[in-house]
Amino acid sequence: MKGEYSTAVETAVKLIWSSFDREKIRQGYAMLMQAAQQGDADALAFIARCFMGEEYVWAQAGFNFDEANASKLMQKSAMMGSATGVLCAVRSANLTPSVERAMPFASFKEAFEEILGQAERGDAFCCYMVANVYFWGDYLRVEPDYAKQFKDERDYNAWAWPIAKVWYERSFDGGLCAGWGNYCDIRKSGLGDISLDVYERYYQMLADISPIICTNYGYYLRKEKGDAYAGLLRYVEAARKGDPQGAYNAGHIYEAGEEVDENISLACQLFEMAANGGLAQGQFEMGYYHFEGCSDLEQDYAQAVDWFEKAYWNPKCSEVTKAQCAAYLGICYQEGLGTV
């Protein structure tokens, strides 16, 4: 608020969005709660982000998705004078006409300029928000007349995305990974003139911070750079940092004996990490391992059924994995294996 975050909010944001450590994230959240209780509107905006799902916060952070509560908090933060709340409310469709009338800013532009000032002074999260304003087209709320000069969306992107690129890079330099996906889209579009050297430098730097990007970087090393073993090491690193997909990918390699000696016991441990992290493929593998009695696991049909059902009902379960689970569950229910 008033052009800068409180020390508590600034520290909490770094803990929640740059540590990828659940204990530190809990500490950061407690700091936000305390600040919010003392009337800090920015704290409310960041608390709201915690409940808006994995597009807004690390999926393994331990926050439950609560859209209704998040909307109320985001709108309240905007009406209390948080420029962060205003910009985030636009992105999450929470800047309703009534909220816009009630906020103490004369316009969206005024709120944007406050965040821009913080970004220019080096705040990484504000750099990210400024980049988003350009990337998603919200800059046309800042300068509505600019819309007249663009023929279509691509014409706008050709102007705005190179600007967004610069702000995303500044956010990366500040240790924030949140804009990486958008940055990759800019590179793929060819509109941002991002060289391979710059792209790979940021990719490696952010992979050292984010478990999710670490997994993706492992895939990049394996498929694009032809370094399968280095990619595996990145999968294992990501798994240790809490990324379920990294754990599953590494487990698959150890199970198949690709680039390394086959190690079913280690594969099982990695699949269990993936399963406990909520990954449907990992849950299926744990069901299969219990069904067959693989590795150090004794055959346990009840456990197998439990894992197969978790995978089957997982909202992110693919059709292929769902079909595999259904086949094994059919056998279990038909034969009374682990279902009685």
Whereabouts are the PLM-identified features?
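Short helix-capping/linker turns of helical repeat alpha-solenoids
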Residues: 3-4, 18-19, 38-40, 53-54, ...
